[in-house]
Structure formats: C-alpha cells, structure tokens
Regions:
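Glycine- and small/polar-enriched repetitive beta-structure motifs of secreted/surface proteins
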Residues: 9-297
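N-terminal low-complexity, intrinsically disordered "leader/linker" segments enriched in small/polar
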Residues: 2-9
Length: 297
C-alpha cells in the first residue's frame, strides 16, 4: 500500500538510525544517524549526519557535521563545518573551522579559523589557529603553529610548531618542523628544510636540500638546489648556484650562473654561465655572458 500524509512530531528511530532534531528537539537542528546530536541542550541550527556526529554538542550552534564521528566531542564550538569520517572529531570549543576529508583536523580541540581540505589535512592540529591546508596530508603534523598555508599533497606535512610558512606544490617544505616565515612554491621546493627561517624558494627543486640555512632566496628550477646549511644566498635562474652547499652571501642571476660554486662565499655572478666553473674561491665578481666562466682561482 501507499502511506500518505504522515506527520511525526518527535524524533524517530528507524533500524537504530535517528531522524529528527536530536536531543531536546532544539529548533533548527537536523539529525540523521545513530547517536547524532545526542547531548544537545540549547545549541541550535546544527546539522549532524552520520553515526555519533556532533554527539557531545551541548550549546554549540550553526555547526555542520557530515560523516561518522565528525565533530564527535564538540561541546560549545560554533560555526564549524566538518565533512568526512572523524573530521574535527576532537573539537570542543574551537570556532569557525572547516574540515573536508577523512581525519581532516581530527585532533583540533580549541583552535579557531582553520581550513583543512584533504585526507589527514591538519590532522594533528590541536591549538594552532588560522591555518590553511589543501591536499592530502598537508600540514598533517602541525600541532600548535598558526598562520601557515599549505597547498599540495604533503605540503608542510612535517611542520609542528613553525608559523607563518607558505608552501605551494607537491612535497614543498615537507620536512619543515619549527622553522618560520618560509615561502616555497613548486614541486619539492625547500623540501628538506627543517629549521631554516626566512627562506624563499620559487621553482621546482629550488632550495630542495636546504636544512638549516636561513634567509636564502632561490628563484628558478633547481636554483640553490644543493644548498644545505648556507645563509644569505640569492640565486635567480635555472640551476643558479645549483651546486652550492655551504657557501654564503653569494649572488647569482642568470641561467646556471655560479652553478659550480660549492663552498665559496661573497661571489657575484650576473649573466648566463657567469662564474660557472668556480667552486671554492671567494669574493669574485663576474658580469656578462660567460664572464669568468673558466675562473677557478
């Protein structure tokens, strides 16, 4: 037969799945799932879909939780959005967070205004605020650091407390832990950096080996690629200063400019192939195409 005109004035349970407004039938709440919005006292305008979604919510308002255990422990947090299994699972009082993807922002507790899109994005974050992570495992290990931006698979994935970093591209700044104010744009840019601060790497594999070196600027594919602990180098152009390891205060502008310098310092090379064979000497100045190309002294 056909059932028409059915009116149900209270929550209903169908095969252990609750459909309705949740505990206390607070106005504006929508519930679909076993245990969803189970503890709500006065929190209104919440949407909970999935097993135990928003189950502990008491006074939090304007939250959306879609997926099993999404926003599971939220109590008073408001204006959060969680889509995916266990997304924002441990949030209690954090506000204005957006988590899309399985385990996204899972351990966030009290932090506000984070955006995580992708599986495990910002998963370990607890109190770090105003972070943006887009991509699977982006900012995965971040705990208390704030104001980081990671766009790309595993971008800034190892970061824990380093703040104000920007990583755009696959594996960019992947090993960064506590370093701050770094900018890495390009596949594997500054991927080995751990504690070096204030570096700028733009281009695939630029500054890729840097670990603790600080205040370096690398613009171009593989620029300063092999630099590890050196500071205050500037390389602009394909593989400019590409072989540098520990040399410091060098400036190379032009494709493969000073590309062989390894430990030399205070060198200036302006022009394509300028100072290309110099390795360990210091304080050279080469301006123009292939200037001092064969210089070794």
């Amino acid at each position: 037969g056909t059932l028409t005109g059915l009116t149900v004035s209270a929550d209903s349970t169908i095969n252990s799945v609750t459909v309705g407004k949740g505990a206390n039938s607070v106005s504006g709440n929508t519930v679909l799932g076993e245990g969803a919005l189970d503890a709500s006292v006065t929190g209104g305008n919440n949407t909970a879909i999935g097993k135990d979604a928003l189950t502990a919510n008491t006074t939090g308002t304007d939250n959306t939780a879609v997926g099993p255990f999404s926003m599971y422990t939220n109590t008073t947090g408001y204006e959060n959005s969680a889509f995916g299994t266990s997304s924002l699972q441990l949030n209690t009082t954090g506000d204005g967070n957006t988590a899309i993807g399985r385990l996204a922002l899972q351990k966030n507790t009290t932090a506000d205004n984070n955006t995580a899109v992708g599986q495990r994005a910002l998963k370990e974050n607890t109190t770090g605020a105003s972070n943006v992570a887009v991509g699977a495992l982006a900012l995965d290990a971040n705990t208390t650091a704030s104001y980081n931006t990671a766009l790309g698979h595993q971008a800034l994935t190892g970061n824990t407390t380093g703040a104000q970093n920007t990583a755009v591209g696959y594996y960019s700044l992947v090993a960064n832990t506590t370093a701050t104010r770094n900018v890495a744009v390009g596949s594997q840019a500054a991927s080995a950096n751990t504690t070096g601060d204030d570096n700028t790497a733009v281009g695939s594999f630029s500054l890729t080996a840097n670990t603790t070196g600080a205040q370096n600027t690398a613009l171009g594919k593989s620029a300063l690629q092999q630099s590890t602990t050196a500071d205050n180098n500037t390389a602009v152009g394909f593989y400019a200063l590409g072989a540098n390891t520990t040399g410091f205060m060098n400036t190379a502008v032009g494709g493969i400019a000073a590309d062989a310098v390894t430990t030399g310092s205070y060198n200036t090379a302006l022009g394509y192939e300028a100072l290309t064979t110099n390795t360990t000497t210091n304080s050279n100045t080469a301006i123009g195409y292939a200037a001092l190309k064969l210089n070794t002294a």
